[in-house]
């Protein structure tokens, strides 16, 4: 079977399966990235807290999650949550092992790992703020929320976008690791197809091309966002 027929949309083609798997990859990566952004904001906020306990918690979190291999984190979340569900089920008379939802546990595991990196990105963005503009806003009589919305947030977002874009690329690549817990995303579908047809190169080449396509499109989106955030700023001569 030729490559075009193999990856076609006919009865013997795998094109539809690969496209569905690509959609699943985008969905799980987007979910994990969003989870990471939320927890990253919390981590960055904790790192600037006056409470030494919160500062220590944020530092310990980022150190631990960046130090443990991502695959191990996925296994811990998947089997840990499955054991918890099975234990709860046994209390109500259910016997046997109950698997946790692969999408949910995978997205949560990757999201919390990415949060460790996003915490550092967001913390660096806040440290790069123009303190003079913040002091001027306070002198003008701005309240905290107005100051945050008009001065702090736009500047922090501008500084954070490049780093956040890099974290997105990391999350996209890490989404392939979720294949080990059975979620049929792009990498898993390539494994299934290559095993069924004994043409692994064709499937892995197609998967690589689709990953690159997602990377290119998302990279363009982040570049447009960066360009938009820079509008109205004077460039140094």
Curated annotation (Swiss-Prot):
Cellular component, GO, one term: ATP-binding cassette (ABC) transporter complex
Major localization listed first in the record, in broad terms: membrane
Transmembrane segments: 24-44, 72-92, 96-116, 201-221
Database matches in CDD domains: TM_PBP2 (cd06261)
Listed GO MF terms: transmembrane transporter activity
Pfam families: BPD_transp_1 (PF00528)
Membrane association type: Multi-pass membrane protein
ABC transmembrane type-1 domain location: 22-222
Intracellular or extracellular location(s): Cell inner membrane
Sorted UniProt keywords: Cell inner membrane, Cell membrane, Membrane, Transmembrane, Transmembrane helix, Transport
Coiled-coil region list: none
Family: Belongs to the binding-protein-dependent transport system permease family. HisMQ subfamily.
Protein purpose: Component of the octopine active transport system probably consisting of four subunits: Q, M, P and T.
Protein name, per record: Octopine transport system permease protein OccQ
Gene: occQ
């Amino acid at each position: 079977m030729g490559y075009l027929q193999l990856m076609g949309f006919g009865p013997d083609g795998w094109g539809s399966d690969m496209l569905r798997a690509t959609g699943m990859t985008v969905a799980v990566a987007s979910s994990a990235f969003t989870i990471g952004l939320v927890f990253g904001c919390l981590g960055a906020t904790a790192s600037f807290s006056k409470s030494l306990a919160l500062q220590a918690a944020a530092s310990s979190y980022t150190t631990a999650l960046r130090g443990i291999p991502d695959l191990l984190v996925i296994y811990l979340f998947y089997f840990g949550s499955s054991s918890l569900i099975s234990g709860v089920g046994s209390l109500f008379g259910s016997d046997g092992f109950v698997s946790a939802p692969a999408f949910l546990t995978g997205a949560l595991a990757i999201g919390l790992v990415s949060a460790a990196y996003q915490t550092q990105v967001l913390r660096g963005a806040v440290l790069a703020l123009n303190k003079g503009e913040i002091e001027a806003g306070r002198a003008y009589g701005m309240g905290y929320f107005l100051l945050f919305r008009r001065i702090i947030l736009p500047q922090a977002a501008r500084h954070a976008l490049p780093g956040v874009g890099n974290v997105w690329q990391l999350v996209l690549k890490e989404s392939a690791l979720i294949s080990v817990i059975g979620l049929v995303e792009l990498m898993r579908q390539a494994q299934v197809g290559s095993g069924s047809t004994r043409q692994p190169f064709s499937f892995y080449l197609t998967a690589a091309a689709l990953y690159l396509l997602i990377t290119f499109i998302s990279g363009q989106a982040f570049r447009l966002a960066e360009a938009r955030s820079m509008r109205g700023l004077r460039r140094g001569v």
